[in-house]
Amino acid sequence: SLCTGMRINEITALRWSDIDYVNNVIHVTKTISWKAGGGVMETTPKSKTSKRDIPMNDTIKQVLQKQKEKIAMVHGEIFARKLDSNVFIGANGTRAIASATVGYSIDNVLKRLRQQGIIIERFTHHAFRDTFATRYIEEGGNMQTLKNILGHSSLAMTADLYSHVLPDTKQQEMKQIENAFTGVAVL
């Protein structure tokens, strides 16, 4: 989520067949929902625009490679090569890891840090998605492209959520336009 901006239930639904190393993209085509009585249900993403391709960079490829190596070490090489298996699975080899498990893991890490005197405010896995979006904008990423990566249904939604990141935008853009007209005669 921190490197892709994906929703947690999109990550938990991710299969090795969704990883396209030829075109360097992750195909987001499904999400995991948890039934009220327990159990997993695979569904289509929450909106038409949630079904999307996310570009992969080298960091994402390294994370995926380490995950594949971890699965091979714990569950065997044959299991790790199955294209229809989930990328992130439970310790017992179950099909998908629960989003609650991710939250529990975050809480455990924060607890261990507190024991070492390092206090970090509690956060949820959605903070990784927000951090991705914030850093993307801070690094000059285009808002329309961010909308597509995040799978938002409208540009307005993306702008409403993340425009606070750009407090000096008007000033910066006036400088850019000034630079564009440097040396041009003014009438």
Task: Please provide the spans of the model-predicted regions.
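Short, basic (Lys/Arg/His-rich) helix/loop patches that form interaction surfaces
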Residues: 4, 54, 70-86, 91-148, ...
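Proline-centered turn/helix-capping motifs that create local helix->coil transitions or kinks
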Residues: 21-30, 37, 66-79, 115
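Catalytic-site neighborhood detector that most strongly recognizes the C-terminal catalytic loop/helix
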Residues: 32-34, 131, 150-176
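Short, polar N-cap/turn motifs at the start of nucleic acid-interacting alpha helices
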Residues: 18-25, 141-161
